[in-house]
């Protein structure tokens, strides 16, 4: 039986004049539709994803299943750049939703204009704007869909914002600035940190002030003081302060001005507010302000000291210690300073009485900095950790030769007794060479004690 086919392709794949394939695989590069067996031409065009508006359609007949174009009889070539081609296709497939979506997906503005009666009909039942936003469409297509009274939904706007298509989002918002649209747009712009468009919407459209609450929370998390202050001028701060967990968001704003504004409007804190403090200079000013308000800092002093140390802020660390801290607080801060290699803070905390062997744990185990190690040894650190020598054993396993040599020179002893571990360490220290080339015939004959001695020798002799 002779079957009519439509072959969608381009001249990279098919020679349309001679009906010759330029590629080996027909179905991978071209869309082949049997007209007799399919009434969903447009759906297949859309699903194939590779049909473009500069492609052509070869209409031909074949008696057998088509695996190549040999023995096929071409009837006509239809170019998709010719609008009349779609009249022919519509005569074969009256389901035009996929066709309109294909026009949108390939930015075929002229075709959309030509079939605007179909666009208007379809827009009543399908969210064409949302579909357009999900594609890489031009502004002309967006404006055309608006002119065709296509719905501008919240989903369309949030999709555009999420995909950073802010020019499209702005057009859609301007076309449908309902209170709900503005509310959701501001919220989504806050979440996506799109400051410029947020400011545009804020300045050009007014909504009930309670709708600003969710946006303000996100700008607090974003730490944008300019936007926060603008929104604070537009809301009832006392009403906003009733929001759940608002104290934590106020602190996360990282703005002393914002914190003071809320306190002036009656917001009160409890000691757990210190859990939301960040490690930077502005947060330190906020901490001092909250302490001056009388909020007890002592339940969270270890955390506050740790933040000072990790951020390397000497003045704030000194401020907190001068307020009054326990010996244990100083010791914990000291271990943090060692682990962070903050030399000046280590010196200061030792001066303030930090126990260098706090909890029978050598502080040296908290660092891999050779200068810090030497300083700790100078100040009396127990590098043998009560005889267990955990520090040297750990350092050897981490391949820190200079660090290990310093420990061995100051009395540490290698006590590892796992043979496999000793063998691995020794071979790595000798770059995989066996000791049999020197004094021993077979490395496997060495005792654990021999291996420890060899490792000690390799470390001490390393450059």
Swiss-Prot record:
Keywords: ANK repeat, Repeat
Cystines in this chain: none
Superkingdom of origin organism: Viruses
The ANK repeat ranges on this chain: 124-154, 156-181, 242-271, 273-299, 300-328, 329-355, 356-385, 387-416
One of the Pfam families matching this protein, by short name: Ank_2
Protein name: Putative ankyrin repeat protein R579
Native source organism of the sequence: Acanthamoeba polyphaga mimivirus (APMV)
């Amino acid at each position: 039986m002779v079957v009519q086919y439509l072959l969608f392709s381009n001249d990279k794949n098919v020679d349309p004049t001679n009906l010759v394939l330029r590629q080996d695989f027909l179905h991978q590069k071209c869309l082949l539709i049997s007209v007799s067996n399919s009434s969903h031409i447009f759906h297949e065009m859309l699903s194939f994803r590779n049909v473009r508006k500069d492609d052509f359609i070869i209409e031909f007949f074949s008696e057998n299943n088509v695996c190549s174009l040999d023995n096929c009889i071409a009837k006509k070539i239809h170019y998709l750049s010719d609008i009349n081609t779609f009249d022919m296709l519509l005569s074969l497939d009256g389901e035009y939703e996929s066709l309109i979506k294909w026009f949108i997906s390939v930015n075929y503005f002229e075709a959309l204009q030509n079939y605007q009666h179909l666009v208007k009909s379809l827009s009543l039942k399908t969210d064409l704007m949302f579909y357009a936003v999900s594609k890489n469409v031009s502004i002309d297509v967006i404006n055309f869909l608006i002119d065709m009274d296509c719905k501008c939904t919240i989903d369309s706007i949030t999709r555009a914002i999420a995909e950073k298509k802010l020019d499209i989002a702005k057009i859609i918002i301007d076309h449908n600035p309902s209170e709900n649209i503005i509310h959701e747009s501001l919220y989504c712009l806050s979440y996506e940190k799109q400051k410029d468009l947020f400011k545009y919407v804020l300045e050009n459209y007014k909504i009930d002030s309670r709708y600003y609450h969710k946006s303000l929370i996100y700008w607090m998390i974003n730490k944008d003081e300019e936007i926060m202050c603008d929104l604070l001028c537009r809301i009832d701060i006392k009403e906003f302060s009733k929001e759940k967990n608002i104290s934590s968001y106020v602190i996360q704003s990282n703005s002393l001005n914002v914190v003071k504004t809320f306190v002036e409007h009656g917001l009160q804190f409890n000691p757990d507010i210190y859990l939301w403090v960040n490690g930077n200079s502005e947060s330190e000013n906020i901490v001092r302000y909250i302490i001056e308000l009388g909020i007890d800092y002592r339940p969270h002093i270890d955390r506050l000291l740790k933040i000072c140390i990790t951020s390397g802020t000497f003045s704030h660390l000194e401020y907190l210690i001068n307020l009054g801290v326990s010996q244990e607080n100083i010791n914990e801060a000291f271990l943090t300073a060692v682990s962070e290699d903050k030399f000046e803070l280590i010196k200061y905390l030792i001066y303030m009485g930090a126990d260098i062997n706090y909890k029978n744990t050598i502080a040296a185990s908290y660092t891999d900095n050779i200068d810090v190690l030497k300083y700790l040894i100078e100040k009396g650190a127990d590098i043998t950790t009560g005889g267990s020598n955990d520090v040297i054993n750990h350092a050897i396993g981490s391949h820190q030769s200079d660090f290990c040599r310093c420990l061995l020179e100051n009395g540490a002893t290698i006590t590892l007794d796992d043979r496999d571990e000793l063998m691995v360490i020794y071979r790595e220290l000798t770059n995989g060479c066996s000791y049999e080339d020197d004094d021993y015939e077979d490395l496997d004959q060495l005792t654990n004690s021999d291996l420890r001695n060899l490792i000690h020798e390799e470390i001490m002799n390393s450059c």
